[in-house]
Amino acid sequence: MAKVNLEQIEHAVRLILEAIGDDPNREGVLDTPRRVAKMYAEVFSGMHEDPKEHLHKVFGEDHEELVLVKDIPFYSMCEHHLVPFYGVAHVAYIPRGGKVTGLSKLARTVDTIARRPQLQERITSTVADSIMEVLEPHGVMVVVEAEHMCMTMRGVKKPGAKTVTTAVRGVLENDAAARSEILSFIKSK
């Protein structure tokens, strides 16, 4: 996949400024095309990374019980409106065969997947599927909570409304008690 074309983004932003009736040569917005291009390169940096690469660093640890990293902050851009949504991800897995990854690797996986034009549902599923594929755990559960600016500042205009999505894989799919335990850990402070 090609890297971000900063010049093309700058040109497009100038066209947008003109299309909304602003003067792209006005002092206040003169550098806006460059700033937006740099921002897009940053917020869409996940387009050029494989999130699974983070998970390949494993430690041989004889632990086959729950590992949960909760309240992982993330931001993304809604692929429908190109406006932000942001929130927290909670990632739980039950290791198998001594394959335990670094805790920061779970957060990096979330970030890489979120830093593309996205849907919250896809972030949730892709995080779970990536962990299942690379770590081959007994089970995975991912819960994502987010506020979407496309619902806050346009359309229905409901600030504060949160969307919650889940993805459950492996043994956790049929174990309601384990899912409840994970949810209780997520809710605890």
From Swiss-Prot:
EC number: 3.5.4.16
MF terms (GO), sorted A to Z: GTP binding; GTP cyclohydrolase I activity; zinc ion binding
Principal EC category: hydrolase
Catalysed reactions listed for this entry: GTP + H2O = 7,8-dihydroneopterin 3'-triphosphate + formate + H(+)
A cellular component term, taken from the record's GO annotations: cytoplasm
Database matches in PROSITE patterns: GTP_CYCLOHYDROL_1_1, GTP_CYCLOHYDROL_1_2
UniProt cross-references to Pfam families, sorted A to Z: GTP_cyclohydroI
Pathway: Cofactor biosynthesis; 7,8-dihydroneopterin triphosphate biosynthesis; 7,8-dihydroneopterin triphosphate from GTP: step 1/1
Disulfide bond annotation, renumbered to this chain: none
Annotated GO biological process: one-carbon metabolic process; tetrahydrobiopterin biosynthetic process; tetrahydrofolate biosynthetic process
Annotated positions binding Zn(2+): C78, H81, C150
Keyword vocabulary terms for this entry: GTP-binding, Hydrolase, Metal-binding, Nucleotide-binding, One-carbon metabolism, Zinc
Subunit annotation: Homomer.
PANTHER family recorded: GTP CYCLOHYDROLASE 1, GTP CYCLOHYDROLASE I
Family: Belongs to the GTP cyclohydrolase I family.
UniProt protein name: GTP cyclohydrolase 1
Gene: folE
